[in-house]
Amino acid sequence: MTLGLRQIKLIMKCLILAAGYATRLYPLTENFPKPLLKVGDKTILDWLVDDIDGAQLVDEFVVISNHKFVNHFQQWADTKPQKITVVDDGTSTNETRLGAVKDIQYAIEQLGIDDDMLVIAGDNVLDFSLQKFVRYAVEKQTSCILRYYEPEPKKLLKSGVVTIDDNDRVIRMTEKSPTPETHWCCPPFYYYTREDARLVQAGIDAGCGTDAPGSYFAWLCTQVPVHAMEMPGSRYDIGDIESYKEVQATYRGIH
């Protein structure tokens, strides 16, 4: 039976990864955080938070920031009706950054998080609702990731890539492999069950990569069943000035 989100009693946290320094967008982001750039009439974070909040399943949004931009995020959070907690990871330069996986664990430890978690990058916009992804993950009852078909080999080399079976279960995941096995790319949107969120430190201790957010998921899929949902729309990645201009010109919101 397919459940509507309103029928689900689950409450979760949403952790937004926003501690990067976006050096490829300099000078635009030299003194301003990329997740607060405007796309249309809203910031990137507004698009993400307002959409997810519509499911009424997230009781707290957590923005993990570096020290350099923590005040920017706090000022933004103060304008929002949702409960938003900003966590400062203490870093001030790109060279001393913790990396996404260590940032996740840092936020978990600082706030004592022990819930299911939606973990997302704060520098992408989508033209579909993440509520569909939450519904998929709740029905699978496992940790989950999104996937989309990427035809260009050059882009595969810079991405997380998954191999799946006929039931969407992830068999393998690699980050930036020189020999990607498939064309299924994974953008940085993850759903972790409470049990699997407790294993992040174990993944770090086992040697999983810590810079790319998908590195923990790549380790996790070797430990427990996890699934990958095909994206029902498009993702717009803002990596440099040109891609930001392109997104500004083409993005039409969530539909």
Predicted segments with their positions:
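Conserved donor-nucleotide/metal-binding helix-loop-beta segment in metal-dependent transferases, i.e.
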Residues: S129-L156
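Conserved N-terminal catalytic core of the sugar/cofactor nucleotidyltransferase
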Residues: R6-I16, R24, K38, K42-I120
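Catalytic-core segments of class I nucleotidyltransferases/pyrophosphorylases
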Residues: V134-V138, R169-D237, I241-H255
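A short, conserved beta-strand element in the Rossmann-like catalytic core
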Residues: N124-D127, R235
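Alpha-helical elements of Rossmann-like donor-binding domains used by nucleotide-donor carbohydrate transfer enzymes
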Residues: H72, K102-Y106, K132, S215-Y216, ...
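Active-site metal-binding loops of divalent metal-dependent hydrolases
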Residues: Y21, D123-N124
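Conserved catalytic core of nucleotide-sugar-dependent glycosyltransferases
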Residues: L156-V170
